[in-house]
């Protein structure tokens, strides 16, 4: 029997600022439990805090940003996306394949 190989992913998630701290924690837990329920493993979560959005999303101008590194079988990503689209607390998400977990996040300064 062929063993299914997992892939390392970097997921960016933006949650609504209207959520209380407890509701935001539960919304994040919903995302992470979705990953683990499909046999994935959470490797690192970076809380980026509250930031201004590049454009208005559902009337929101700000959001809470999280970056999650996780491993999962590639076929599961489509199922996770279906769940994300049903999550009203999640304003936006992006999932990318990556080669390594970033322990420290570095951002370049914008030119003035």
Curated annotation (Swiss-Prot):
GO terms for molecular function: small ribosomal subunit rRNA binding; structural constituent of ribosome. GO terms for cellular component: cytoplasm; ribonucleoprotein complex; ribosome. It holds the Pfam family Ribosomal_S6. It comes from the Bacteria. The keyword RNA-binding applies. Belongs to the bacterial ribosomal protein bS6 family. HAMAP family: Ribosomal_bS6. This is Small ribosomal subunit protein bS6. The lineage of its organism: Bacteria, Pseudomonadati, Chlamydiota, Chlamydiia, Chlamydiales. The gene is rpsF.
């Amino acid at each position: 029997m062929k063993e299914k190989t997992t892939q390392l992913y970097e997921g960016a998630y933006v949650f609504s600022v209207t959520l209380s701290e407890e509701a935001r924690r539960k919304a994040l837990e919903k995302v992470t439990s979705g990953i683990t329920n499909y046999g994935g493993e959470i490797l690192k979560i970076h809380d980026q805090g509250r930031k201004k959005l590049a454009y208005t999303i559902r009337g929101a101008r700000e959001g809470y940003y999280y970056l999650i590194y996780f491993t999962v079988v590639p076929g599961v990503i489509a199922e996770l996306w279906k769940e994300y689209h049903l999550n009203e607390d999640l304003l936006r998400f992006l999932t990318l394949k990556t080669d390594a977990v970033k322990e420290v996040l570095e951002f370049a300064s914008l030119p003035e």
